[in-house]
Amino acid sequence: MEASLKEQLYEARVAQKPKDRDLKSMKDRLASMTFKSGNTESMNNPVSKTRLIEMYDKMKLLQWPKVKDQLQSRSVQSKVVQGLIQETFRTAAGEANKKKQQIEEAFGLNECSSGLSPQKVKEYRQLTVQNLQMALFHTNKEELLKSGFPELGGQFSEEVMENLRPLTSECYWLSCLMALNNPPLQPDWKNLVPSMDPWDIFPRNITSASVM
């Protein structure tokens, strides 16, 4: 009787092994699909390309006009503000790219020593960047700006900076999120269409950089 039970258990384990392999293979395929950047986006992802563009448009169309009115009342020049906004986006993207490069370097070492396949290393690397992106999404925007760009706006009075701070914090935060997207995104400053309104300083379009 005991021998029969052992034999049945052994046969059950043998029969289960292919199922376990199939389950692992399915999980790996699903994980791989999650990391594909292509045109597929998760509707629940708060930092998807679509959501990032929506946040940029909302800032440009709703937040910026209020700040612009305050700055105009203080006789601030639009060109100076435009330069500040561009520098904020540029600096934030640079800081985000540094962090991404550090992740690249760390996973480059892991690829040599871990024995994982290049595809698996790429997936883990992308997941780490996505986790960083989500962490920044939930970060206090003004604190992020202070830590990453402490010298911002030194040429302005405290009153003007008080008006600008919510906007520059939003720009810095959003630029970090855009830079960590796959592919990276940024406002299309190179093709900024001249406007009759000198205060129309934000590009209409978002451009994609090369894939990570």
Label each region the model flagged.
Residues 1-212:
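Extended, amphipathic alpha-helical stalk segments that mediate dimerization
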